[in-house]
A protein has these predicted regions:
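Amphipathic alpha-helical assembly/interaction segments
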Residues: 1-127
């Protein structure tokens, strides 16, 4: 995975995914780990970091358009999973409404950019 500062700064999708993963890690550090919370914490950290990792890999131009689209489609599934974990965390009162709203908005923004990127890749493939 190529993730140097220049690559991140030039890619809004990657920047936002790194920021989301970092914020979720910071949030999870504040939640008391126990037999119930630990699996939830583990899953949301895994899914949000997978979004970032797959966007990073999909952003590398040495891969084919098919491979890049595949990586972005994985990221799309992982962002959906991240949103589901956030919803569960809010419902179980592990996070406050304002934190849920902020992180959900970030997820939605990333989701929209992923849809747009996939649409562009598919359009250029058929050209």
């Amino acid at each position: 995975m190529v993730c140097n500062k220049e690559v991140i700064q030039g890619n809004q999708l990657l920047e936002q995914s790194v920021e989301l993963a970092a914020q979720i890690i910071e949030l999870c550090r504040t939640i008391k780990p126990d037999v119930i919370n630990s699996p939830i914490i583990s899953q949301i950290v895994r899914s949000s970091s997978s979004v970032m990792a797959n966007i990073s890999e999909g952003s590398v131009s040495i891969f084919s358009q098919k491979e890049r689209a595949y990586r972005f489609s994985i990221s799309l599934r992982e962002i959906e999973e991240t949103m589901s974990w956030l919803l569960l965390m809010k419902r179980c009162m592990l996070i406050k409404q304002d934190i849920f709203a902020k992180l959900s908005e970030q997820c939605l923004s990333i989701k929209k950019m992923l849809f747009s990127s996939l649409k562009t890749l598919k359009a250029s493939k058929s050209s």
